[in-house]
From Swiss-Prot:
Coiled-coil annotated spans: 297-327
InterPro entries registered for this protein in UniProt: Caulimoviridae_Movement, Viral_movement
Entry function: Transports viral genome to neighboring plant cells directly through plasmosdesmata, without any budding. The movement protein allows efficient cell to cell propagation, by bypassing the host cell wall barrier. Acts by forming tubules structures that increase the size exclusion limit (SEL) of plasmodesmata, thereby allowing viral ribonucleocapsids to spread directly to neighboring cells.
Subunit structure as annotated in this protein's UniProt entry: Homotrimer, through the coiled-coil domain. Interacts with VAP. May interact (via N-terminus) with host prenylated Rab acceptor protein 1D (PRA1D).
UniProt source species: Cauliflower mosaic virus (strain CM-1841) (CaMV)
Highest classification ranks of the organism: Viruses, Riboviria, Pararnavirae, Artverviricota, Revtraviricetes
A GO CC annotation given for this chain: host cell plasmodesma
Name of protein: Movement protein
UniProt key word Transport: yes
């Protein structure tokens, strides 16, 4: 079945109706975006688990009626596999953990659906979130100590602990930082806060590095998702929930600049993932923070360090007393 109407030809769209595939591209001064959409007919080699109910085992009916019922209740899975890529520069003022970046939006999905034939578009009801790969790249020289914290959350969920899809901490001193999150769940296209389902929060700790208006880094992300007419259409690969890419290495030659020493022993950190954050680029409002602690609490760690120092001082004092007493 050809999913795309023949008259739909846009300048930003490359269409191959024979292969049921479309590519959307857009680039301007704000950034670059690219989207791929391919129909299920081109991916028949992917195995799917079908949910079936044998009506003949529930109702006693004549054979002719049975055949009519089977035909009447047969259903074809319509699946569009989509890959969306976007790149944008981030102002240092917007990199303080006070705003969120929606990685998938209703506007984007509606744009994809508008390219389909009406009979296919009207039955699409679900979006299945497969994977999100995020790459941060510094817009300054290598070697500057610039820790950064990232959290991907489902901001529809009220509990700040349960909303977390993945979190990571890195350092842009090496030029870039990348990780992948696998949400692996489906949601209705009619859900009220669809734009908040994949919310990216980023906290650039070296806030005095530049002034407001200066672009501190580039965020490039790829979202793999599928649009379907059923919640039972998709199986996910058995990946881990989050994967951290091994990109903590020097990139290029710094020359005449001192390269900082980065401490990798910090396992306890927190990031503010409070609800009702402003959209990236919008005016921010004062709000009550809600930090998610990763690892043990910092206060507990400080207490343990203090106890260790006290114990060490007691041992030193004990040795001095032994020397004075001639023991």
């Amino acid at each position: 079945m050809d999913l795309y109407p023949e008259e739909n030809t846009q300048s930003e769209q490359s269409q191959n109706s024979e292969n049921n595939m479309q590519i959307f591209k857009s680039e301007n001064s704000d950034g670059f975006s690219s989207d791929l959409m391919i129909s299920n007919d081109q991916l028949k080699n992917i195995s799917k688990t079908q949910l079936t109910l044998e009506k003949e085992k529930i109702f006693k009916m004549p054979n002719v009626l049975s055949q009519v019922m089977k035909k009447a209740f047969s259903r074809k899975n319509e699946i569009l596999y989509c890959v969306s890529t976007k790149e944008l520069s981030v102002d240092i003022h917007d990199a303080t953990g006070k705003v969120y970046l929606p990685l998938i939006t209703r506007e984007e999905i509606n744009k994809r659906l508008s390219s389909l034939k009406p009979e296919v578009r009207k039955i699409m009801s679900m979006v299945h979130l497969g994977a999100v790969k995020i790459l941060l790249k510094a817009q300054f020289r290598n070697g500057i100590d610039t820790p950064i914290k990232i959290a991907l959350i489902d901001d529809r969920i009220n509990s700040r602990r349960d909303c977390l899809l993945g979190a990571a901490k890195g350092n842009l001193a090496y030029g870039k930082f990348m990780f992948t999150v696998y949400p692996k769940f489906g949601i209705s296209l009619n859900t009220q806060r669809l734009n908040q389902t994949l919310s990216l929060i980023h906290d650039f700790e070296n806030k005095n590095l530049m002034n407001k208006g200066d672009k501190v880094m580039t965020i490039t992300y790829i979202v793999g998702y599928a649009l379907t007419n059923s919640h039972h259409s998709i199986d996910y690969q058995s990946n881990a929930t989050i994967e951290l890419e091994d990109v903590f290495q020097e990139i290029g030659n710094v020359q005449q600049s001192d390269f900082c020493t980065i401490q990798n022993d910090e396992c306890n950190w927190a990031i503010d993932i409070a609800q009702n954050k402003a959209l990236l680029g919008a005016k921010t409002q004062s709000q009550i923070g809600n930090s998610l602690q990763i690892g043990n609490s910092a206060s507990s760690s400080n207490t343990e360090n203090e106890l260790a120092r006290v114990s060490q001082n007691i041992d030193l004092l004990k040795n001095k007393l032994k020397e004075i007493c001639g023991e």
